[in-house]
Amino acid sequence: AAGVYVSGGTGITILGNSIYSNTGQAIDLGTSGVTANDAGDADSGANNLQNFPVLTSANSNATGTTIDGTLNSNANTTYRIEFFANRPSIADATNGEGERYLGFITVTTDGSGNASYNTTLANVWVNSGDKISATATVDLGGGNYGSTSEFGANITASSTGIIVVDTTSDVSDGTTSSITNLGAARGADGRISLREAIAAANNTANGGTPDKIVFNIAGSGTHVINVASALPTINQALIIDGLSEPDYAAAPIV
């Protein structure tokens, strides 16, 4: 079944959620599965079969994640575009899901119904190999919103010297021969541990420009990484940024 099924009606808003690992698609408007975009978004149905964004690239670097894309929908209309990241092991094969909410931008279409965007989500990072998707929601102004689209098609993110640690586990079962290879092959748990991140950084030549390990560990409260043995000796320029964990408080203890 779909994560969120909109059987009919319009103006149904779906914002800032985490929707993934469903047997069907994350958001389904009507009963037809993925509804293809139509030029000018003139069709009707559940949530007016709102067109979804089309993403063209996503890259994480030291400052954040830059995403490019377009939206074709109703002319001269404002939309909230929300971005989501998914681990490769849980992403749908085609249109995306919404495991981790990254942030949003606001765009306004022109007289032909087109909007393009090149935006950087500051201090928000994804791993190489993550699947990125997006939704579009009509922005009515004043904090009010209308119909939300289905998730757009996945694109695969790249990263420039960024690794996101997303588990407190000390397991090392991923491919650590490089940062890119670790993103593509994360092992049985589908996650990246601090041990794996350091090993992959060590095996990725950076010419003295530091790679950066950041954290995004699910759940609240104190995250404790208990290591069973000494972590790898760092042999490349590397920053380990404990302050990057979204719910950190006070100072990280290392």
Where are these regions (language model features)?
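N-terminal, post-signal-peptide segments of secreted/periplasmic proteins
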Residues: 2-254
